[in-house]
């Protein structure tokens, strides 16, 4: 028998590609030694990463379970069925498709199933907290459809449901989209359902940012009210990067299945679907509810402390994991603030605020999220410390001594709340 132990297929990453292994180690170190406040990011469990890094990456499986175009799918069929069952249980849905590669892919599949080019859609303006796929002119959704956009009230910086209703009555959209990427308040899905029924529109909820909160019962669920719900599987859900489509009515199921495959994708990523199944299973456990409650409590603590430090927060607070700072209150742009906090190992992102006078490349806002640091074990007291570091840095941008102290405080927080315990093995170990 030929000895294949030295074959390239058996080489470790360190041996096969030390350049990539080294860069992975650097990213691992960054995650461990920086404070992650990007609202769309989180840290998965080791189990999720183990599933995603498994031999399932080798398997092609076009089609749905037991309706594949390839042989040898009996095990990935069982895995995908388990992911579907868990997703339906987690969100109380009648049907689920776990194959979308991303939230954007999930949204595109919904458009393909329900709309024709030129149809009218009603979605939130990107600069008010919407998403690119909700009709932004730079996205395919804004190029293929007639887009009408709504925003928030200028005074309250919250959704004005009567204003949205008037737009719907005027333009008669075929699809109304709710669910956002930078809206810190709760969404009244029942009110959107009422508007959709009044104008005869389909209702899509994109709950990508709040899916984990919905699963835990911390935010109202869109599933009972919407014709279709899309989400990512990372963010507050704490799974792998991927997408998911849910609906409450089996009438739509076949249309959405066909819109995913063959309509907009080829073979599903079965290794990612396995990781989704693991994450759904984790989210079904009681401790995930406690985690999600802490995510919101931490966001509210962060927002309150920053307001005490005289930094304005859009809408005056938050009901979810997002805290959106309006930096006009301290005479600063989001672009500058992003660089300043990055210098002290805090990762966030510049973001437009409602009625922003700055361009999307500059912005007047800084978006923060609490999901990732809550995974590390941060509580309200720790987030008060985080808020003080942010405020000290932004309010003293030229003070080198304060910058050095901020770096020390960030380092101390990272040591007090390690990311993984025990730590992950370096790829170059």
From Swiss-Prot:
(6S)-5,6,7,8-tetrahydrofolate binds at residues 126, 130-132, 359-361. The record marks 234 as: Plays an important role in substrate specificity. InterPro entries: PyrdxlP-dep_Trfase, PyrdxlP-dep_Trfase_major, PyrdxlP-dep_Trfase_small, Ser_HO-MeTrfase, Ser_HO-MeTrfase-like, Ser_HO-MeTrfase_PLP_BS, SHMT-like_dom. The modification N6-(pyridoxal phosphate)lysine is found at residue 235. Homodimer. Belongs to the SHMT family. This is Serine hydroxymethyltransferase. It is an enzyme of class 2 (transferase). SUPFAM superfamilies: PLP-dependent transferases (SSF53383). Pathway: One-carbon metabolism; tetrahydrofolate interconversion; Amino-acid biosynthesis; glycine biosynthesis; glycine from L-serine: step 1/1. It is found in: Cytoplasm. Gene3D superfamilies: Aspartate Aminotransferase, domain 1, Type I PLP-dependent aspartate aminotransferase-like (Major domain). Keywords: Amino-acid biosynthesis, Cytoplasm, One-carbon metabolism, Pyridoxal phosphate, Transferase. CDD domains: SHMT. PROSITE patterns: SHMT. One of its GO terms (molecular function) is glycine hydroxymethyltransferase activity. The keyword Amino-acid biosynthesis applies. Catalyzes the reversible interconversion of serine and glycine with tetrahydrofolate (THF) serving as the one-carbon carrier. This reaction serves as the major source of one-carbon groups required for the biosynthesis of purines, thymidylate, methionine, and other important biomolecules. Also exhibits THF-independent aldolase activity toward beta-hydroxyamino acids, producing glycine and aldehydes, via a retro-aldol mechanism.
